[in-house]
């Protein structure tokens, strides 16, 4: 909370614990279910109560067991302070547009809870049996290369596969955010997917809309990095309501305590757009209540400095 004050963050939506990036790769589905439920209870009972207005949580669900994941989603929907549930970009190398995951999407749609896709870098695993894999990781000899590629590539693959396999058409009220991979790739990826749908139409039988239409719809959102100088162009091409600020606190590549200031000073990002990206989009996306937003804005004080 002290660091949030220094950074200028009124409300934080938190992806918590290293368990989040590995639990969906466990071969033992029962263990995965128990770990997800344990972390979720810890969030609700111990972590978020430190300041229930300012701290919001992203719950974990065992996606390798879609029925159990749907049950855990129903549990999360009843917990104060949980505003989303996390999806991996793949489970055992199986992409998230696969229909085996439909029970998760159906439940998320029914309870009105947005899902948040978070990428990963590792490649340990065996297709169809265990592991959550990072695209290209097995070919990279340095972590710098792995991190630079896998996070963004995994989000691109997850978005493409969920669009192409008709997830957003089968579940028209489903909301999914793609996080921690930047936003600068969106205009390029939307154009490329449109081209491939147009020229290879028989391979997209389940898709009822152009990929760019889905990317610009209220069904999907993305997070940006505070240093993305192309952000104004992204908002022009994809839409102002699609992108939310993310601090990436407290990873090695975060800009703490200057990320809010950095984003606010991006050339071409006017005051209205700053307000939208820094707060309004997240308030709408995560269904935050007005009474949960502090009256005396920490961000306002920081930006005034």
Residue ranges of predicted features:
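Mid-to-C-terminal alpha-helical segments outside catalytic/metal-binding sites
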Residues: 1-11, 41-49, 71-75, 165-166, ...
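Active-site gating/metal-coordination segments in enzymes
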Residues: 5-158, 162-165
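Short aromatic-enriched loop/helix-cap "lid" or pocket-rim segments at secondary-structure transitions
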Residues: 26-27, 126-131, 188-192, 256-258, ...
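Active-site neighborhood of phospho(di)ester-bond hydrolases with catalytic His/Asp-centered motifs
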Residues: 58, 86, 118, 179, ...
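Glycine-enriched alpha-helix->loop->beta-strand junction motifs that scaffold or abut catalytic
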Residues: 80-84, 109-114, 171-174, 216-219, ...
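Aromatic-lined glycan-binding groove of carbohydrate-active enzymes
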Residues: 115, 119-124, 163-213, 217
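Glycine-rich, phosphate-binding/catalytic loops in enzymes
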Residues: 133, 195, 261-263
